[in-house]
Design a protein with these regions (language model features):
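N-terminal export/targeting leaders of redox proteins
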Residues: 1-22, 102
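Sequence/structural segment immediately N-terminal to covalent heme-attachment motifs in c-type
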Residues: 20-37
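Axial heme c-ligation environment in periplasmic c-type cytochrome domains
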Residues: 33, 42-53, 66-96
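Acidic, glycine-rich flexible loop segments
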Residues: 56
Length: 102
């Protein structure tokens, strides 16, 4: 039982570190200027985005494309600017994966 608890505790620490790294990447990439993790700023809260697309198998590809190209009309009238090429493709994928995990 102690071994199982140790494994669970280790996994929790690793996942928390991964989430912190993803949030730091979102901050560095400028995402948090318009989005909050828990609350709407100019754009939707990341947790709301994750909830909207939960169970959608194509969500990651859709959101990566939306983050790269920008767009409007999905979450209100405020357009989201294109984020490519200034944010690397692999960083966009990492951020989207994190948002969908919230």
């Amino acid at each position: 039982m102690k071994f199982l608890l140790a494994i669970i505790a280790t996994a929790a620490v690793l996942l928390a570190g991964q989430a912190s790294a993803s949030e730091a990447l979102a901050q560095k990439s400028g995402c948090l200027a318009c989005h909050g993790v828990d609350k709407k700023v100019l754009g939707p809260a990341f947790k709301d985005v994750g909830a909207k697309y939960k169970g959608d198998k194509g969500a990651e590809a859709k959101l990566v494309a939306k983050v790269k190209a920008g767009g409007s009309g999905v979450w209100g009238p405020m357009p989201m600017p294109a984020n490519s090429p200034q944010v690397k493709d692999e960083d966009i994928k990492s951020i989207v994966h994190w948002v969908l995990s919230l």
